[in-house]
């Protein structure tokens, strides 16, 4: 397997008082966060807490309602060409062969580098096949190659392994970790799998009701051995916080739920 040519150091990120609202609903509330260049950060939390919204803001797919996103002293939007986002679905075009999916949107002489990145993810021999011939894990490898060919400094991962079987998921985790160590880009991984977050990240963020409720450093050597006592203890710490949030957070959650139910009842009465 060949090595992809050097990718520049990762993008540093600063969030200053970031908020995001959809109508009257606040999804992200006054986020303050600094991520150093090349750091691997995992973001966990309950469904609807704002994890994926955060990634969309960082990718430039949506604008924040409040605050500023920075990369160093410049706006993060200036680094948009160096940012790539991977989704849970590989989103390959079925009418284009694997190599053409990797080079999608590129001009000039890109095919040699496309073959190189496919080799990096272990799929050089599938370059001229159709996506329909690939397994779910192989499709995600193609999606990863499609991101790598752009030489990203910031890689955003929105549950990219969530639909894979357990063994394929472990293999993909190892591949992502090796590529990150080799090339030094900054990674933000959104995942519902706390064990995955602990195994891969330098740092785990827990988002609760649109705010950062926990910021936990994972100061363990790599490669990390699954099932180790230290990993299990960290996983238990995060899970306990996810399942048993502080009283203020839970009261806020119940208040929002009651408010929504009250609004729905009022609408039914009015009708």
Swiss-Prot record:
Domain ABC transporter: 13-234
EC number: 7.6.2.14
Reaction(s) catalysed by this chain's protein: ATP + H2O + aliphatic sulfonate-[sulfonate-binding protein]Side 1 = ADP + phosphate + aliphatic sulfonateSide 2 + [sulfonate-binding protein]Side 1
Key word Isomerase present: no
Disulfide cross-links: none
Gene Ontology terms, MF aspect: ATP binding; ATP hydrolysis activity
Alphabetically ordered keywords of this record: ATP-binding, Cell inner membrane, Cell membrane, Membrane, Nucleotide-binding, Translocase, Transport
Disordered, as annotated region: 250-271
Coiled coil: none
Stated name of the protein: Aliphatic sulfonates import ATP-binding protein SsuB
Biological classification of the source: Bacteria, Pseudomonadati, Pseudomonadota, Gammaproteobacteria, Enterobacterales
Gene that this polypeptide is encoded by: ssuB
């Amino acid at each position: 397997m060949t090595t992809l040519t050097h990718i520049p150091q990762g993008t540093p990120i600063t969030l200053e008082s970031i908020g995001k609202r959809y109508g009257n609903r606040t999804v992200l509330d006054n986020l303050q966060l600094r991520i150093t260049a090349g750091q691997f950060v995992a973001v966990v939390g309950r469904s609807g807490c704002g994890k994926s919204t955060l990634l969309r803001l960082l990718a430039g797919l949506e604008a924040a309602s409040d605050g500023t996103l920075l990369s160093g002293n410049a706006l993060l939007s200036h680094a948009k060409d160096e940012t790539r986002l991977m989704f849970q679905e590989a989103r390959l075009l079925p009418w284009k062969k694997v190599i053409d999916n990797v080079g999608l949107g590129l001009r000039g002489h890109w095919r040699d580098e496309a073959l190189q990145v496919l080799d990096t993810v272990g799929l050089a021999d599938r370059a001229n096949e159709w996506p329909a011939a690939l397994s779910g894990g192989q499709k995600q490898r193609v999606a990863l190659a499609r991101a790598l060919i752009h030489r990203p400094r910031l890689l955003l991962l929105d549950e990219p392994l969530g639909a894979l079987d357990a063994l394929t998921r472990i293999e993909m985790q190892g591949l992502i970790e090796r590529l990150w160590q080799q090339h030094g880009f900054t990674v933000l991984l959104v995942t519902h799998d706390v064990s995955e977050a602990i195994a891969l990240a330098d740092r785990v963020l827990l988002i609760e009701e649109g705010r950062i409720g926990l910021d936990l450093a994972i100061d363990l050597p790599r490669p990390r051995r699954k099932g180790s006592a230290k990993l299990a203890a960290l996983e238990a710490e995060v899970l306990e916080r996810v399942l048993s949030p502080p009283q203020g957070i839970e009261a806020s959650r119940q208040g929002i739920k009651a408010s929504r139910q009250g609004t729905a009842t009022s609408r039914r009465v009015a009708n």
